[in-house]
């Protein structure tokens, strides 16, 4: 894992909506995404202050933000808003932000909440954080598969040995 994910750090996932920011945070083992309460959007400076305080409290080392790519692979206005949000956050924090294709994450999150028998009213308050958890879980699963592949390439070792040198 990169140094910015060492020392008990976690990862955060964000799902940006027009009215809320869905937030999820990983466990320290980078296996599970846990939804957190949504941040109600007011204006960027206030939203950023609330978000940065939460990221600090949760000991976050990096942030995955959902990038709403259209089904044809193009980027529309919502993707541009997400990119602008990250550009603005980069001026306030040195945390690394990475984009993650969030296609259908809200649909998957809503299906899960329906299966859990949440009423429409309860789903409305949780959908963005559930979508953030889906985004983050995708990142965590990818990290796990990359870590597993690296261990396989290294013959089960976690560090390169003398025969692995180029």
Swiss-Prot record:
It holds the Pfam family RuvX. The keyword Cytoplasm applies. Its main location: cytoplasm. One of its GO terms (biological process) is rRNA 5'-end processing. CDD domains: YqgF (cd16964). One of its GO terms (cellular component) is cytosol. Keywords: Cytoplasm, Hydrolase, Nuclease, Ribosome biogenesis. It is found in: Cytoplasm. SUPFAM superfamilies: Ribonuclease H-like. The keyword Transcription regulation does not apply. GO terms for molecular function: nuclease activity. Could be a nuclease involved in processing of the 5'-end of pre-16S rRNA. Belongs to the YqgF nuclease family. This is Putative pre-16S rRNA nuclease. It comes from Mesorhizobium japonicum (strain LMG 29417 / CECT 9101 / MAFF 303099) (Mesorhizobium loti (strain MAFF 303099)).
């Amino acid at each position: 894992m990169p140094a910015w994910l060492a020392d008990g750090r976690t990862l955060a996932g964000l799902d940006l909506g027009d009215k809320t920011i869905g937030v999820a945070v990983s466990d320290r083992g980078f296996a599970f995404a846990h939804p957190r309460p949504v941040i109600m959007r007011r204006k960027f400076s206030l939203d950023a202050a609330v978000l940065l305080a939460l990221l600090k409290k949760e000991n976050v080392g990096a942030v995955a933000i959902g990038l709403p790519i259209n089904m044809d692979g193009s980027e529309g206005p919502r993707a541009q808003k997400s990119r602008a949000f990250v550009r603005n956050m980069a001026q306030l924090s040195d945390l690394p932000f990475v984009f993650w294709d969030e296609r259908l994450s809200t649909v998957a999150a809503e299906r899960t909440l329906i299966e859990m028998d949440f009423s429409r009213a309860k789903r409305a308050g949780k959908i963005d954080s559930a979508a953030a958890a889906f985004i983050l879980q995708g990142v965590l699963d990818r990290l796990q598969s990359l870590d597993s592949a690296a261990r396989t390439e290294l013959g089960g070792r976690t560090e390169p040995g003398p025969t692995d040198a180029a």
